Curated annotation (Swiss-Prot):
Primary gene name: LAIR2
Record keywords: Disulfide bond, Immunoglobulin domain, Receptor, Secreted, Signal
Signal peptide: 1-21
Residue segments, region Disordered: 120-152
UniProt protein name: Leukocyte-associated immunoglobulin-like receptor 2
Length: 152
C-alpha cells in the first residue's frame, strides 16, 4: 500500500471516530405541568417538555404510546435549553394518566423522560384544599406551543 493511501485511510478512520464520539447519546428530556399535576375537571393544564437547543420536534405521549401529540414550535429558553408546551384547555377525567416526552434532534430521537402522572379530582372547596398542587417535574433535561391533547 502506498504511503499516501495509508495516510488517507488513517485520516478517514480518525474522522469517523471523531464523528461517532461527538454524536453520543442525546440527553433525556424533562416534563413538568402547570399549574400542577392535580387538576379539577374543566380547568386547564399545560405540559412543558424541555431538551437541548437544536430540537426540531417534541412529542408528548400518553402511557400506552398510542396517543401522542407532536409540536414543531420549539422555543429557545437560553443558550443550552429549548421547550415545547402542550395545552389541555378543559381537563376531563379521560385526561388523567401518565405522560412523558421525547424529542427529535438530528440524527434521531431521544430517550423518553420519566413519567408524570396527571390526576383529575373534584376540588373539596375548603380554604386549605387548593385545586392544584404546585408544579411538578420529572425526568432529567430539555419546545413550543400546541393545541389540546385529546382524551383516549
Amino acid at each position: 500500500m502506498s504511503p499516501h493511501l495509508t495516510a488517507l485511510l488513517g485520516l478517514v478512520l480518525c474522522l469517523a471516530q471523531t464523528i461517532h464520539t461527538q454524536e453520543g447519546a442525546l440527553p433525556r428530556p424533562s416534563i413538568s405541568a402547570e399549574p400542577g399535576t392535580v387538576i379539577s375537571p374543566g380547568s386547564h393544564v399545560t405540559f412543558m417538555c424541555r431538551g437541548p437547543v437544536g430540537v426540531q420536534t417534541f412529542r408528548l405521549e400518553r402511557e400506552d404510546r398510542a396517543k401522542y401529540k407532536d409540536s414543531y414550535n420549539v422555543f429557545r429558553l437560553g443558550p443550552s435549553e429549548s421547550e415545547a408546551r402542550f395545552h389541555i384547555d378543559s381537563v376531563s377525567e379521560g385526561n388523567a394518566g401518565l405522560y412523558r416526552c421525547l424529542y427529535y434532534k438530528p440524527p434521531g430521537w431521544s430517550e423518553h423522560s420519566d413519567f408524570l402522572e396527571l390526576l383529575v379530582k373534584e376540588s373539596s372547596g375548603g380554604p386549605d384544599s387548593p385545586d392544584t398542587e404546585p408544579g411538578s417535574s420529572a425526568g432529567t433535561v430539555p419546545g413550543t406551543e400546541a393545541s389540546g391533547f385529546d382524551a383516549p
